[in-house]
Amino acid sequence: MSSDDRHLGSSCGSFIKTEPSSPSSGIDALSHHSPSGSSDASGGFGLALGTHANGLDSPPMFAGAGLGGTPCRKSYEDCASGIMEDSAIKCEYMLNAIPKRLCLVCGDIASGYHYGVASCEACKAFFKRTIQGNIEYSCPATNECEITKRRRKSCQACRFMKCLKVGMLKEGVRLDRVRGGRQKYKRRLDSESSPYLSLQISPPAKKPLTKIVSYLLVAEPDKLYAMPPPGMPEGDIKALTTLCDLADRELVVIIGWAKHIPGFSSLSLGDQMSLLQSAWMEILILGIVYRSLPYDDKLVYAEDYIMDEEHSRLAGLLELYRAILQLVRRYKKLKVEKEEFVTLKALALANSDSMYIEDLEAVQKLQDLLHEALQDYELSQRHEEPWRTGKLLLTLPLLRQTAAKAVQHFYSVKLQGKVPMHKLFLEMLEAKV
């Protein structure tokens, strides 16, 4: 049994990819597969504690209920109040109006999570046949065929590219009964894609990813959208209002993401809260940095909200813009890959500087697990760069410094009282000051 296998256990719950939704929809946003509802409807800082074991190819998501049945509702009891004296944060839990899930490839009803993605049996089988059979397809048209339930058989090439695009993991397919291996198959990159954003079938020379890294890839949340208030005049207030609302919605997503980090849910509730309260801004900034890698001197706060130097100056964010851009340039120089990014993000959470950890040994084990996962990845995939792990880890202090600047800036915005802030963002901001 590998070191990854020993630590995975039941902490790797399922993760449902989501679509953007209006922040005004509150808790109803969940019924549209969206994590984008603000925190006000859910009562502030919450950790969804109930997890179940789920691998890359999981059982059906709704045991004991038909996919077309009535949405199930489940309430959770209030849990312990916050650790920090300056921020008595109460946890409230609610899982509201869970809809039936759709296959991310063709839109049919999903039967479960297959190879890391909610998908139907037909697309699951198609992806498996393609990988195990070492099959290459050719599109008779322009590689842009629409893949729907009715038309999914019309073009195998575009269907396979769609499987890759939504994130199906090659590591989930068993190859031990097939001679040879897979041919290198690169999906066509769309206009917004880049080497930083694509997840491709790798050449046979590359070794399989460790399970930890594979699970972190699966746990990655879907894109969020800023959706700036349309009626508000352009200026610093609109920019700050947009970013504060976006940060609040991202925090809701981060809390759900954290419990899918192998080993995190086994920590005590108090330690989970302490780590999140300490590292949330680092995680937010690391996301901005990674999204900004394909761009020159621009920060991608969200897919629909990109700020250059002039925009940042008008918003009063020039100092923060320059600090984050310094990180972007550093990661760009390292040519950081998505597998490294997701592991560094988990490490930023586990390596937080919280003074309120109850079980230091348990947190240390989580840190060791993630350090080992990063090191194993570098040894197997980037063995020609023996010092790469150290170089990546040395970016974390600068990330922490940048996060501290961001916290101070938004706390000063809070004190001015000119920009509305949602409950969760306020609580987490006060916990850091």
From Swiss-Prot:
Positions with biased composition (Low complexity): 28-38
Region of interest: Interaction with NANOG: 93-211
PTM comment, free text: Acetylated by PCAF/KAT2 (in vitro).
Gene Ontology molecular function: any one: sequence-specific DNA binding
Domain NR LBD: 208-432
Region (Essential for ESRRB transcriptional activity and interaction with NCOA3): 203-433
Keyword Repeat appears in the UniProt entry: no
Highest taxon, organism lineage: Eukaryota
Entry's Gene Ontology BP terms: cell dedifferentiation; cell population proliferation; inner ear development; morula formation; negative regulation of stem cell differentiation; photoreceptor cell maintenance; positive regulation of DNA-templated transcription; positive regulation of stem cell population maintenance
Gene3D superfamilies found in the cross-reference section: Erythroid Transcription Factor GATA-1, subunit A (3.30.50.10), Retinoid X Receptor (1.10.565.10)
Keywords: Acetylation, Chromosome, Cytoplasm, Deafness, Disease variant, DNA-binding, Metal-binding, Non-syndromic deafness, Nucleus, Receptor, Transcription, Transcription regulation, Zinc, Zinc-finger
Keyword DNA-binding: yes
Annotated consequence of substituting Y185A: 6-fold decrease in DNA-binding affinity
Residue segments, region Disordered: 1-38
Subcellular localization, as worded in the UniProt entry: Nucleus; Cytoplasm; Chromosome
Sequence similarity: Belongs to the nuclear hormone receptor family. NR3 subfamily.
Subunit structure: Binds DNA as a monomer. Interacts with NR0B1; represses ESRRB activity at the GATA6 promoter. Interacts with NANOG; reciprocally modulates their transcriptional activities and activates POU5F1 expression. Interacts with NCOA3; mediates the interaction between ESRRB and RNA polymerase II complexes and allows NCOA3 corecruitment to ESRRB, KLF4, NANOG, and SOX2 enhancer regions to trigger ESRRB-dependent gene activation involved in self-renewal and pluripotency. Interacts with KDM1A; co-occupes the core set of ESRRB targets including ELF5 and EOMES.
Disease cited in the entry: Deafness, autosomal recessive, 35: A form of non-syndromic deafness characterized by non-progressive, prelingual hearing loss.
Protein name as it appears in the record: Steroid hormone receptor ERR2
Organism, as annotated: Homo sapiens
Organism phylogeny: Eukaryota, Metazoa, Chordata, Craniata, Vertebrata
Gene responsible for this protein: ESRRB
